[in-house]
Structures are given as C-alpha cells and as structure tokens.
Amino acid sequence: MADRSARRARPGDDSVGQFVIGAEIGKGSFAQVYMGKHKVSGAAVAIKSVELARLNKKLKENLYGEINILKTLRHPHIVALHDCVESATHINLMMEYCELGDLSLFIKKREKLSTNPATHDMARKYPNVPNSGLNEVVIRHFLKQLSSALKFLRESNLVHRDVKPQNLLLLPSPEFREVNKLARPILTASQDSLVPVAGLASLPMLKLADFGFARVLPSTSLAETLCGSPLYMAPEILRYERYDAKADLWSVGTVLFEMIVGRPPFRASNHVELLRKIEAAEDVIKFPRETTISSEMKGLTRALLKRNPVERISFENFFAHPVIISSIPGLVEDDIPKPEASEQRSSSKDTRAASKSDDPIASPRKYSFRRHPTDNDQIRDQFRRVEPPSSAAESAPSRQTSAFSGIAAEARKQAAAEASARTGQSSRNEPGDNLVPRRPQAQPSTSAPSKPGLYEERRRGISNASLNRSNRESSSPTSAALANDSARAPPQQTSRRVQAEEREKAAQDVAFERDYVVVEKKHVEVNAFADEMAANPRLGGQGTPLSPKSGQIVRRATQQGNPTSTTGAIPAAPSRTMQIAQGTQRHYHERGTSLSASPGSTASFITKAIQDASLRLLGIKYPAGLTKGASPPELYNPYPAYPTPSPPVGLISSGKQSTPVDEDARVAQLIEEHATRSDVVYGFAEVKYKQLVPLAPSAEHGLGGTTLEDMPTGEEDVLTVEAIVSLSEEALVLYVKALTLLAKSMDIASLWWARKNRGDQANNALSSTRDSVNTQTLSLRINSAVQWVRSRFNEVLEKAEVVRLRLMDAQKRLPDDHPSHPSNHPQGSESVNGASAEGVFLTVGVTAEKLMYDRALEMSRTAAINEITNEDLAGCEISYVTAIRMLEAVLDNDEDAPKRRLSANMDDSGGDGEDGHAEINADDQQAVQKMIHMIRSRLTSVRSKVRMISNASKAQQQSQPQSLIRRRSGDVTPRSVPSYSS
C-alpha cells in the first residue's frame, strides 16, 4: 500500500486528500479499487487508483477532461465522481460507494439473495424463477432505472459505450437504508443522489458506472480487452466499424436478456466466433422454456438485439416503450402505488421526480398492508435524513432545473401521449455549459481532416444535423401532424414509415457523422484481419512456430541506441498495443462473416484505415493503390537498416527462394517485400525517434522507451526547440510512410484470404497431396507475415502518436514569430504543402520521399567509398540493399504503374489525383529509377568481390590443412632408429 500514492509514502499514512484508504475491494486491468471513508464525516467512498505509467500525455489530458465532466454530472442512477487526486504514481478517483457490488454478481448469486439482509425482503416478495434469471418485477425495476440514466446521457449528448452488468452497480434500497439508520453512511454528491427517480423504493438502487473511461484510458491488447466484455458489444463494434449511440441499446438488450435468462444471449471463446454466432442467429432470439416472462419483455429484448443498427429500436421508442413507462405488474400490496401519487408528482416542485408518472417511489414503510397517502416531498425528506451532513450541505437547485429538465418533462407524460412525450428532448442540444459540452471538440482520432477549416465546416455540419434531428423530435406542428397521421395510418403503413424514417436518420448520421465515435486502441481493422487469420485452425494458429526457411518474418530488434550500437530495444508486445478504426462504416449486408476484404475491392478496409491514420497524423491521404501485375525484382534480400544483434541478418529469410510458381507463393513474396520495405523506412524513422526519446528502453513501456512524462527535465538542454521540431517532423512523415507500406501488405493478404475462402472447396478437390502440403506451408508463411505486419503496424502507429504530440508541444514553445508557431497558422489556414491536421503543421518541403532519397544517396555514396578501399564489403552490401529498398519505397508502386494500367481489374480513380502530395512527377521517377539502376550495378560488383574473396579464402583454408598435416606428421611420428642387428 505504501507505493500506491505519494501521500501514503510514510508508514501508516494511508490517505489521499480528505479520504482514508481501506482494504482493496476490486481490481481491474488498469486500476485497483479500495474502500475509503471521508476523514470528517466518515462517509464511505470507493477509491479507484489508476496507474499513471499506463497513460501518456494525451491520454492524461483526455482523462482530465472526462473527469471534469463527470464531476459535474449528477443523476441518481449514475455513479458520481466526488474528487480526483493525482500522486506521483497514480490518479485516485473518489467515486460513490455501492456496497451491493455489480449486477453480474447479483445475477450470479441470485439463489443466495435471501441470505443478505439488504436483499432478504426482495427475495421473499419476488422470488427468482427456478433455472432462470431474476423475477420480472426486479428486471423491470432495474431496466427503468437504467433507461433513466441512459436518457439523461442521451439528452446530454453522451454515449456510455460499455454498458454491461459489471458496470451496473447496486445499492441497498432506500427503505432498507431508512430502517437501518445505523448502517455505514455513504458520501453522496447531492441531496437526492440516493433518491431513485424510477422503479421501486423497496428494491435495490442501480447506478451506471465507468462511462466515458473506455475511450480515454489505455486498453490492453485487443484479445484481452475483448475477453473483458465482448459478450455485450454491439455487432458493429465487433465488426470494427464506426458506431453510433445505438450500440448502447444492443448492450442494454444483452443485459436485459441476461437478467431474464441468467446468461448472455451469445457466448463464444473469441470475438470472431461471437460475431459469427450473432450473424448466424439472424435476429432470432430464443428464450428457454423454463423462462417465465411476459411477451412485452420478450418483444423489447428482440427489438434491442437487432444486429443491424438501422433496424434496432430507436432511443425515442425505447424510452416510450410500455415496459419503461407503464407500471410494473405483479407487485405485492406494499409496493402498489396509489393512483393519486401520479397527480401529486405532476405538480411537485421537485424537478427530480420519477421518470414516469405511473411508476412512483413507494413509501419507506415496510410491509404495512394498508398504505396511507404520503406526499412525495415528505418521502424525499425522509430519505434525505439518512444522508451524511457533508452531502446535505450541497445545494443543487440550479442543476436540477437545467440538467434534469428533460427527465422532469418526461415524468409528466403518459403512455398514451407518446408524441407529446418528445417535446422535452429538444433540450438535448442545449446542455448547461458547466455540465457537458455540446459535443467533444476533439477530432475523431482516426478521421481528422487535413485542414482545420474543413474540420470546422464538418463541426458545423454536425451541429446542423443535431438541430435537424431535434426538430424532427420536437413538438412542432409538422411533427405533431405526422404523429397524428401515424396514429391513424394502418399498421403496415406505419411500420414502413417508421422504417423509412430510421433509414433516413441513419443516412444523415453517416453524412454528418453525428454522434459517431471512433474506436481507438482496441478495435482495429488491421488487428481484426490478423486475429481472424490467427484463429483459423487451418493456419495452425498463432502458436505454430515456423522455421526461418519457411518464410516466417522474424521481427528484428528495435533500434534505440546509437546507430553503431548493437543494443536493440525490447520489442513491443506482439499482441495489439495500438489500433486504429476503419474510416468508413460499411453496411452489414455488404459483408459476410469474414473480416477480409471483398475480392473486387481495389482499396480494402486496411487501406482506408491507413488513410485515416495519415489524415490523423499529417493530413496526408495516400493513394489507395494495390500492388498487382508482375512481381517486383528478385534481388531484394531483406536486411535491417542498421546493425542489430539478431540473426539471421535478413528480416524475412535468405531471399534464395525460387520464383513463385503459384498464386500463394506470389502473394507471400509480395507481402514480405512490402513488409521489408516498410522495415527500412521504419529503421530510418527510429534514428530520428531515438534522438527524441534517448533513454534506455524498458520493458515497462510499450514503446520500447520511456513516456513523455518520465523524461528527465534536462533533456531540453541537449536539444533545442527547433531541433525537436525538425526531428519530430521528419520522424512523423517517415512513420506515416511506413504505415502505408504495411497497409499495402495487409491489402494483398486480405484479397488473398477472400479468394482462398471462396475457392477452398474447388482447390481441395483438384489439388494433390503434395500441392496441399505446399499450400499449407505457404498459408502458414503468409499468416506469420500478417502477424508480424500487425505487430509492427501497432508499434509504428503508437510511436507516430508520441512524435505527433511531441511536435505539437515543441511548436507551442517556439517564438511567436517563428513560421511553425501555432499562432502563425490560425484556424482556417492551410499548410503550404497541405500536410496539416488539427494542431499539426509541417515545415514546407518536409516529405518522407525527400528524406528517404537523400538518405539512400548518402548511404550509397558512403558504401561506394568503402568499396573502393575494400573496407567492410559486407556493410557495403547491406547499405546498397537498404538504399535500393528505400528508393523503391519512394517510388512505392510507381515502378509497375504501366503494368497496373494494363490490368483490367485495376481502377485508377480520380481521387488519387487529388492526393498528389504522395505522388512524384515523371522526371523525379526517372531520376530515382536511374539511381536504383546505378546502385544495383554497384551491388553486383560488391557481391562479386565478396564471392571472390570468399572463394580465395576457401581455397586457402583447403590448402592450409594439408600443410599442417604434413608438418605435424613429421613432428609426431617417431624417426626411424638404425638397426644394429646383423
């Protein structure tokens, strides 16, 4: 415990701020949760301690932004954040304490609820159904409270994105707390934080927790993250698509199904299998025979568990569903509300009334078979008496009138007035300035536009879309007339109209990207495809080792030290340390269960992902070309760009494999060649990166180095601000270039995978046993290459993000009159070379192609000098090969452009012409090709010299042992002794 916080460094000093830390009550992948209490009032809190080592600078900034929002969010069914205290090693979040644990534990231990004093009466009144889930009364109670929290988030333009039973925390019922006044007090964020606005006062109170953190906290690898909560993720998230707020509704459906049945609706060992099961079910949700549940509940569950977001029930219809707004059937007499309670609630001055008029909070009196009318305000006053004085001192009248106006409006509506119930939802576009922002101003991380002006235009478009959507939902005369027409229309016509409206809404959401969030770090197309290949049993899985002779790509050590050093950094975990989302949402009808690209696509989803990464980092969108036509020249022998200790010298293999004889071999060679070129560019970028992050690498950090926060304060004494800007710009463009080459490797692999899945049966019927073995070997080889590309892609993307943040920070520290200072690039202006993104501007002339050309020229000249003097011929060969690969990376696919144009399957779209920043003109192409030809000549010459020297050395070694044998024979054999015999 002593190392948990700087405030607890001394023995016995177990406190953070105004709170004393107790025993550990929970643990997650990135944080530990402790029991705590306030030093003055003794009220209980939950202290979540987040490790700072897992957060880089950007993530910390985003986390603090989320924390500031959470500190102002006040809703009875959302776990409140009291305070945040940062120590030297941790960020400690003081949250509301929920002593009954989470809903998953509640469901798991449902047979033992009668043994807990806080749930004993509930289990007696509403027993669970044998071999099933919870009682329907309890389910409806929890669902009402969850919908109340989601409605509040919806009105505040917030999306939870991680609704699951583990994030639904429970408190003892208000009646239990009223009777047991000696129980431990709980620190509340407001006077009515423990007063439910929906459900029954005799049942446990539900609170939604941990929303928003999933976006800003770093996740673990993709597989580990999906093992945490994939069973509740929407199919669009599992397909690695952009998703809107309707993803929460799918999660609500899975939680509802689990409460009914006692288990999730879909279970699988991995997310790929889970997605296939969801697709195979075809929206048919079956309930076990033992389940005793009403048809209304089944219908709502099926409406929520629609795999197509367009067909899924809308938020408006969900909030207006009879299960949500109607009274709960099957209540015992104690919990049946009085009819007049509805009228009292409508006229109540408290705007935090129950979410629906006919679902009041029951009196705190327990088990009286005759209920006396009790005023709603008196009930709330009785509940407030059990709150600690520290929370009672807080006043929130202004917050109640602003933040909960939508909920109060909804509380005054009846089920029959569904159309008028939407009048209070227009406030969603006008949240309080101190509560939540209208929309987060940060750009989507993987789809940042190349120009700030364009982003501002899109932001205005988003705002207009929100207004249009709210206008449709408001009680304008037009909408009222449409509602009346819908009420009078036949059911089939109404259904068609509703479906058409839903599709129109979805189209507008896509057009304006309203309410869309981008999956970061854990949902990546690159990792999805690699996971699918790794999980395929025909490829042997990730655990199948391959020898270097089979063509497996061996990851070389990351060069972090001096270029002449042989000390490499510890490579990043090959799982999924960094991920990027697909840039364009695809309709689910357009894709099968496979995550590979469609056969006819010239720019697969991986290319779109890398284009979004380029936009995010630089504002550069590279052409989406895919290598086709003849194979590149055979001379490529992959070598690391700089000396490393890992044998063999080659990145992939010796390069002595024969010319490809079939499609699989050609694909394997193309993938490896593109990966090898990317490795050369990556090595060049590492030279820049190691100057920005010069400390020794450590296994504690995923980047093979240290984080920005852990750098020594004296580093700026070594590098000037101008030098940091220059190095950051150069490293950034080189990393993006490496990403494009890696993406092209994935493009080739995805098309091959699609063709292979389509033609397996025919090929298996015609192929011989020998061909099958050869195909299996090549498939394993391609799978190994894909896994290496995925690992390198994640590593490069993360390092590029670090460099981008370093560049932005350095540019802010430049003199105000410096051309690269942000003040000299006001919003709406463009970078001269077009390479700009939000907050990132590159100096004119800084391009990856120019840097690579100059580097290749320098390396070849140095190698030529050494070749003339016969010094380090092996190093000369490495330099020549590296220079050739670097120049080929400059040309990218331009060396076989004429062949591609002759291909009928290749379509040179006009969009590439617009992105001409990544293209080079014809004169430059000829100059680069001429340089490649010259270096190849020198490479042939130096290899001839190496062979001659090797042959001479072998001949000398062969002759040397014979002379040694003759010399040793005379030394060892005894000389003849003259005979004296007669």
Curated annotation (Swiss-Prot):
Any GO BP annotation: autophagy of mitochondrion
Active site (UniProt): 162
Expressed in which tissues: Uniformly detected in conidia, mycelia and appressoria (at protein level).
Taxonomy, superkingdom: Eukaryota
Catalysed reactions listed for this entry: L-seryl-[protein] + ATP = O-phospho-L-seryl-[protein] + ADP + H(+); L-threonyl-[protein] + ATP = O-phospho-L-threonyl-[protein] + ADP + H(+)
PROSITE patterns: PROTEIN_KINASE_ATP (PS00107), PROTEIN_KINASE_DOM (PS50011), PROTEIN_KINASE_ST (PS00108)
Principal EC category: transferase
Positions with biased composition (Basic and acidic residues): 335-359, 372-387
Biased composition (Low complexity): 388-398
GO molecular function: ATP binding; protein serine kinase activity; protein serine/threonine kinase activity
Annotated S-S bridges: none
Membrane topology: Peripheral membrane protein
EC number: 2.7.11.1
Family note: Belongs to the protein kinase superfamily. Ser/Thr protein kinase family. APG1/unc-51/ULK1 subfamily.
Description of how the protein assembles with itself and partners: Homodimer. Forms a ternary complex with ATG13 and ATG17.
Name listed for the protein in its UniProt record: Serine/threonine-protein kinase ATG1
